[in-house]
Amino acid sequence: MSDLPAHTSIWGELADVDHELRHVDVGGVRTRVLRAGSSGPDLVLLHGTGGHLEAYARDVAGLAEDFRVTAYDMVGHGWSDLPDQPYTIDVLSDHLVGLMDVLGIGAAHLSGESLGGWVAAWTAAHRPERVDRLVLNTPGNIADKPEVMVRLRESTMAAVLDPSDEVVRRRVEFLFHHKEMVTDELVGLRRAVYSRPGFVRAITNTLVLQDPEVRKDFAWDPDWVGRITAPTLLLWTDHDPTGGLDEAALLLEWLPRARLHVIEDAGHWPQWEKPEEYLSVHRDFLLTEAQTV
């Protein structure tokens, strides 16, 4: 039986949590940031392609009990600025490190979902001094399967070109194993983001990562993945449409200090579908296990 109250709304998840929502300047990019929690290690949460910080609405309160939590909208996403440039992994990683600089965070735990996991891993490999521990939450398509790239590109672009309730709902439902958990509010938020002036151009700049010619420079590869020294948790599910356990096995081979946890009965967004287990696994890995090293 769940220890968390039933989800009513995003505001309901945050109503009793001391938090701050604001924009900060990161190298000229106006960046939307939510922060909560006053003690414990820093934990930065990274959303996925076309996403926004509300992806973690069901988790902020629980995480803030033990961590100083930062969730943010990546450059070109959510309600952050949309500069006209390709949002490749190095650009997204530089934006993350720049945000940490602005917020005075020297090093932090990083937990990234989907694209956010890719960015977090790249940062851990190329800026190891900024990453304590790493959680890769359904990072997706480690094997660079063309059909997965096509599906993500086409479904995302369709929703941005036609941000109607029906089309955007279909895009959000792609993230869930339990489609009935997709709320009108969540769809409405995505519709608002996808309707922003300039967002068609922005999502085009994001989806360059689904072009094999661009992707090859940043694709998951043992050469750079093997340089990650941070202890790493691979957080998989049994119904992720972007990548199965065979891809988790690849990362277990490449990463020198990794272990796998599989959340059952969930899709690409376990942090929303299974928040209790998501929180428990994070606490165990980032707090309990860290103390035993």
Enumerate the language-model features and the residues they cover:
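Alpha/beta-hydrolase fold catalytic core
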Residues: M1-L43, D66-F67, I105-G106, R283-V293
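Conserved HGGG/HGGXW glycine-rich cap/lid loop of the alpha/beta-hydrolase fold
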Residues: D25, V29-W79
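Conserved alpha/beta-hydrolase catalytic His-Asp/Glu region
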Residues: T31, E147, P163-G226
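Conserved acidic catalytic loop of the alpha/beta-hydrolase fold
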Residues: D90-A108
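Flexible "cap/lid" loop of the alpha/beta hydrolase fold
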Residues: A121-A125, D132-V168
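Acidic catalytic loop of the alpha/beta-hydrolase fold
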Residues: V214, H239-G243
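Short beta-strand/loop motif that positions the catalytic acidic residue
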Residues: I228, L234-W236
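Catalytic active-site module of serine/aspartate enzymes centered on a nucleophile-bearing elbow/loop
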Residues: P256-V293
